């Protein structure tokens, strides 16, 4: 083992919609986790890898946001986030720039007090506030928890992200190289493709629908002798009325989702894609243990 090589696992936590997936995507330098302006976009732990052969390797776990669960899927998401705190070497807690520490933040603080893992607080979106305010926010958070570091940053603008990486390496132990240098994620291509389709649906649909949708890949196969991949995917919703909205007038909404998804999938896979989408109704699937597992959210892992 290289005695100068550091390695370990880092989880990114925070309330829903605070910018966790955006931060991870920018740290890695490639889009892996889906992003949206709607809360609870991330449903699984997404494992991505940052490698600097001179310093070490960081394995990031982007977890679902910690929030009050409203159904079994919500309970699963919160359990994933909280369970991860016990598994990692460093915790990144992402917050928005504010003096207000609400019930959600207090809940996270209580969870952090149960572990001995070093916690780096990242105050995100500092590009949206005055500089003098940032000092106030840092002082506010210093009073509620003994953070290893507090870093003002902007995930979207990639501001201070080098400092975030430096501070992570500061607290990582010396250890082995877990993944090859070129590896950036342990997510299979089918899972990433499904998440891209779900992201485009999140962006296109009204607030009442997105949390009730899942996407699974029915078929994904390259054509022999051709630079093209055929992908058949199904968008699952909970209500017949939602199905109509997802399809849209004359199929316009489904076509829009498919077109936007296809463009990004082609960039990801570096090949032409023939994408076909279907919509099915599975009533109240978020309260069905069987369907939650069937759509790729595995409770047995936590």
What are these regions (language model features)?
Residues 1-79, 83-86:
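Conserved G1/Walker A P-loop phosphate-binding module
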Residues 19, 160, 253:
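Conserved glycine(s) of the Walker
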Residues 30, 49, 53, 69, ...:
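Conserved, well-folded catalytic cores of nucleic-acid-processing
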Residues 42, 67-68, 100-101, 129-130, ...:
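Catalytic P-loop NTPase motifs of RecA-like helicase/translocase cores
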Residues 51-55, 79-150, 221-225:
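Conserved C-terminal guanine-recognition region of P-loop GTPase G domains, centered on the G4
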Residues 62, 124, 154:
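Active-site glycine-centered loops adjacent to acidic/histidine catalytic or metal-binding residues
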Residues 117-118, 127-188:
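Canonical P-loop GTPase G-domain recognition
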Residues 189-302:
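P-loop NTP-binding site
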């Amino acid at each position: 083992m290289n005695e100068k090589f550091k390695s370990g696992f880092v989880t990114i936590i925070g309330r829903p919609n605070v910018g966790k997936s955006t931060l991870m995507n920018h740290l890695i330098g490639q889009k892996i986790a889906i992003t949206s302006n709607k809360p609870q976009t991330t449903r699984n732990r997404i494992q991505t890898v940052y490698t600097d052969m001179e310093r070490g390797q960081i394995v990031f776990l982007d977890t679902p946001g910690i929030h009050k669960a409203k159904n079994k899927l919500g309970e699963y998401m919160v359990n994933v986030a909280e369970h991860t705190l016990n598994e990692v070497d460093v915790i990144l807690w992402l917050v928005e720039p504010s003096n207000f520490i609400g019930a959600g933040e207090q809940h996270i603080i209580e969870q952090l007090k149960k572990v001995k893992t070093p916690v780096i607080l990242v105050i995100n979106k500092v590009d949206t506030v005055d500089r003098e305010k940032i000092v106030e926010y840092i002082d506010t958070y210093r009073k509620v928890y003994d953070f290893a570091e507090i870093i003002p940053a902007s995930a979207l603008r990639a501001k201070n992200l080098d400092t975030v990486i430096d501070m992570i390496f500061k607290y990582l132990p010396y250890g082995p190289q877990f993944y090859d240098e070129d590896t950036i994620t342990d997510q299979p291509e089918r899972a990433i493709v499904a998440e891209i389709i779900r992201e485009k649906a999140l962006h296109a649909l009204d607030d009442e629908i997105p949390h009730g949708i899942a996407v699974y890949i029915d078929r994904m196969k390259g054509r022999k002798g051709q630079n093209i991949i055929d992908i058949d995917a199904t968008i699952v919703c909970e209500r017949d009325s939602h199905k109509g909205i997802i399809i849209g007038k004359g199929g316009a909404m489904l076509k829009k989702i498919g077109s936007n998804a296809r463009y990004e999938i082609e960039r990801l896979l570096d090949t032409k894609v023939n994408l076909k989408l279907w919509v099915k109704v599975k009533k109240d699937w978020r309260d069905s243990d069987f369907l939650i597992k069937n759509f790729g959210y595995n409770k047995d892992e936590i």
